[in-house]
Amino acid sequence: MSTDKTNQSWGGRFSEPVDAFVARFTASVTFDQRLYRHDIMGSIAHATMLAKVGVLTDAERDSIIDGLKTIQGEIEAGSFDWRVDLEDVHMNIEARLTDRIGITGKKLHTGRSRNDQVATDIRLWLRDEIDLILGEITRLQKGLLELAEREAESIMPGFTHLQTAQPVTFGHHMLAWFEMLSRDYERLVDCRKRTNRMPLGSAALAGTTYPIDRELTCQLLGFEAVGGNSLDSVSDRDFAIEFCAAASVAMMHLSRFSEELVLWTSAQFQFIDLPDRFCTGSSIMPQKKNPDVPELVRGKSGRVFGALMGLLTLMKGQPLAYNKDNQEDKEPLFDAADTLRDSLRAFADMIPAIKPKHAIMREAALRGFSTATDLADYLVRRGLPFRDCHEIVGHAVKYGVETGKDLAEMSLEELRKFSDQIEQDVFAVLTLEGSVNARNHIGGTAPAQVRAAVARGQALLASR
């Protein structure tokens, strides 16, 4: 079974119609139709430019623009008939335009190829997606700042190797994620700059013989600059790869954060409680409250990593210029953007609602000799070399393990077995508050520094 070749914009050179399966196999309209708004935006700018340089009359321009706006309305109303035999979003819209306004619709593609058209559409779409994602990052960061300020003095154990290390404040811990997200934001802003270059006017690969005004089209579409080489403009997708790389780093951060939330909500930790609206239950175990949102975000990170590898693999063997391989760029790019945006939205909604369990976190911080480093630092201030202090405290910890006592639970007499430099004032050092308050410098966990970091973060968000 074959399709009617007259449906194809390029059918003139062919002596038989395309096989029906091949038509379906090579079509992209089932997924690239989401570019319709940006495709129409680009076409309106292109028609405006063609009229300005005399390729179209003003009447033809107006007819094309009115027709395109009507088609956009049909698409958004759900009445547009997407046809697989017309291959893609571009030809579906152009065919419908010609149906509506007649032969003038066939003039729209003058001086343009689908190669530069789709490259323009994707860049316009990705530019908007990045803006939405940046907004979600900012919203999540705002929630983190609110939580950090609220919990500036709440003490929890800090971990290395998932073993108790030193006491930190819950607010300080939340600010670590704020910092990572700030870098994610910066990476996406940088990616947007390189995305915001206009391919339109490059035509198939060598440019066009028509007297086009690319600067005008660039201005109309809000691009920062036109692409400087037509071959490069139509063929490369490094901007999409860069986005997926930045998205992968952001999803890696969210995945790590998710892992902590999953641990902290478990019966073994019980550090926090998540509201019921962010959890689900079990079909068999009545007691279960599962942290599905962070678990899914952790799992979805793999989709974005896969999109990055897919695009790198897609591009690695292509000669210049455009190749049909590039049709495969959209689905991984779309999925990466959707996944990152939705994951950020879920976190931005969930994080401000976290309820730390202060007593449990504090009790956990009291276990595991979390103030051992503070005792070593105390001895350093008494004039001993740090390595000797490390050895002394190691012996004290060993004694504590054997007797079941934390350092703060030992008597002065017991502590002095390990160093006669230890005096009564050591017990102020060994408290959780003494430990966190002592780290009172930029980037430290002291409550005063947490509040200062929150203020800096609020100023950063206000400057965006």
UniProtKB/Swiss-Prot annotation:
The record's keywords, sorted A to Z, are:
Amino-acid biosynthesis, Arginine biosynthesis, Cytoplasm, Lyase
- GO CC terms in record: cytosol
Q: Tell me which InterPro entries the record gives.
A: Arg_succ_lyase_C, Argininosuccinate_lyase, Fumarase/histidase_N, Fumarate_lyase_CS, Fumarate_lyase_fam, Fumarate_lyase_N, L-Aspartase-like
Which PROSITE patterns does the record cross-reference, listed alphabetically?
A: FUMARATE_LYASES
- Location(s) in or outside the cell: Cytoplasm
Give the enzyme's EC designation. 4.3.2.1
Task: Write out the coiled-coil annotation as residue ranges.
Answer: none
Major site of localization recorded for this protein: cytoplasm
Report any one BP term from Gene Ontology. arginine biosynthetic process via ornithine
UniProt pathway: Amino-acid biosynthesis; L-arginine biosynthesis; L-arginine from L-ornithine and carbamoyl phosphate: step 3/3
Reactions the enzyme catalyzes: 2-(N(omega)-L-arginino)succinate = fumarate + L-arginine
Question: Which family is this sequence assigned to?
Answer: Belongs to the lyase 1 family. Argininosuccinate lyase subfamily.
Q: Which NCBIfam families match?
A: argH
Q: What is this protein called?
A: Argininosuccinate lyase
Lineage start: Bacteria, Pseudomonadati, Pseudomonadota, Gammaproteobacteria, Pseudomonadales
